[in-house]
């Protein structure tokens, strides 16, 4: 640029313009601005000029970083085509909704340009996109003081919010959590009161990942109760399980010797393994995965009360309960890893849950074998008869 701001192109014989190597990176501002030799130039017309120092937007780098990661030590070229063809396209991209109109746009442009140049074989950089929702929380704004209050400085009376210091009624809105609005939550305080696992479970359970999540302390308390119930039922009943039964031989269960209650709890277990697996793998709906484990816990509680506590047991009951304990702990491990590892040790294991294989299910054991036949007379229900599915007319 000249002193009037007019733009001049660099002479072709001077290309490429190389950046100086003696720059000191202080962490403040634009490093090239500190190089007088690079910044100050003489224009072709003999006038003084100033060279552009904003030379590389970060999007230029981030638009192909996924390719460089595959060959980060290559000093001869950005990446080997063989590596790019082997690993791309990226299976899963996770980012905020703003990425759809910014980074993704630039990355696709770069990738398609690289394809045209013969440097990559794939036409698209990413297979699948997940845009996570925002975490929302109540903000408290003072019209008089023109500032946002921290929740700890607010008193709630009959659904209205007031400043503890001045008594002024505050304007309440549910908004994206941010420092500027003082409506964030301190993870350390949450962990101190409820523990890390309840915080994780609540965050994952409260909403699908692509939806907004409204922070709710009552939800945290619910997650805390759920984890405690799971811990208590397993720690109180693991002695009942057959310690020698294991996944190597499908726990040695003879399906023909199961009681009706045995059959029901095993069916619910295999349905839950299927539901959790599909919820995680297919659409990242961790909330429905956790909900499925909660349902299983209810059935486990009923089974414990009606079978274990009444000592109405058989050899198959003990084997099935061992399968239930093993698999429910592994199912909850991604969401509550600390409590899962504690329970894993309680039932006699010496490894960590993350070292174990993901539990499997048998499709046949997930099927319903009973149904209710409803008897209606003149449009009114008179009787409901339980019957096996497939019963001949």
Regions found by a protein language model. Give the residues of each.
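Glycine-rich, small/acidic residue-mixed loop/short-helix segments
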Residues: 387-393
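Helix-rich, typically C-terminal accessory recognition domains appended to large enzymatic cores
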Residues: 1-3, 105, 109, 119-123, ...
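Short secondary-structure boundary/capping segments
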Residues: 142-149, 184, 217-219, 346-350
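Hydrophobic/anchoring residues in structured secondary elements
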Residues: 131, 386-387
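Cys/His-rich finger/ribbon microdomains and the adjacent scaffold used
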Residues: 1-96, 104-107, 112-182, 269-270, ...
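Conserved, non-catalytic sequence blocks in retroelement Pol enzymes and Pol-derived host proteins
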Residues: 96-99, 282-283
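Amphipathic alpha-helical transducer elements in NTP-driven molecular machines
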Residues: 184, 224-227, 393
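Hydrophobic alpha-helical transmembrane segments of multi-pass small-molecule transporters/permeases
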Residues: 92-96, 186-189, 327
